Amino acid sequence: MATPVKVVEILSAEDLRRTLTRLASQIVERTRDLSQLVLLGIYTRGVPLAELLARQIETLEGINVGVGALDITFYRDDLDQIGLRTPAKTSITLDLTGKTVVLVDDVIFKGRTIRAALNAVNEYGRPEVIRLAVLVDRGHREVPIHPDFVGKQLPTAKEEVVKVYLQDWDGRDAVELVGY
């Protein structure tokens, strides 16, 4: 990839904390029965985001919700464009039938990752409802997918990149917009 021309901080560590608190509150408000809630993080950054949201929901409501990790590598329709990577391990230890599943991802762009995730989820049961939570929605959809919970709407140019940094993975919390 080319050298970045411009890097702009979109969310600081404190902004990110507040955004996750708001997302967790919105998920709680829209979920009838929290005991049936499962957060499925999509590799890579969606996994720690799902864990952070689960902790925040526990803080808010005093209930542990189910958390899993979903690798959608073999469900993608654009492998020829993005290339095949070594798959991560999907970790879903419960039947999703009848559950309220919230797919969690860091950034939604074209929508293809979420389309693949919807296909993958069906292998683990038939949820009552599937919702989508994203930290950043940057637009430019190529498929008709719309998130239910959005931390930050961020109009971008197609060639720009949104980078999400999380303490447990990257040593810092921030969201940056990178222009090339």
From Swiss-Prot:
Its EC number is 2.4.2.9. GO terms for molecular function: uracil phosphoribosyltransferase activity. The keyword Transferase applies. One of its GO terms (biological process) is regulation of DNA-templated transcription. Pfam families: Pribosyltran. It catalyses: UMP + diphosphate = 5-phospho-alpha-D-ribose 1-diphosphate + uracil. It is an enzyme of class 2 (transferase). Keywords: Glycosyltransferase, Transcription, Transcription regulation, Transferase. A motif (PRPP-binding) lies at residues 101-113. Regulates the transcription of the pyrimidine nucleotide (pyr) operon in response to exogenous pyrimidines. Also displays a weak uracil phosphoribosyltransferase activity which is not physiologically significant. Belongs to the purine/pyrimidine phosphoribosyltransferase family. PyrR subfamily. This is Bifunctional protein PyrR. It comes from Trichormus variabilis (strain ATCC 29413 / PCC 7937) (Anabaena variabilis).
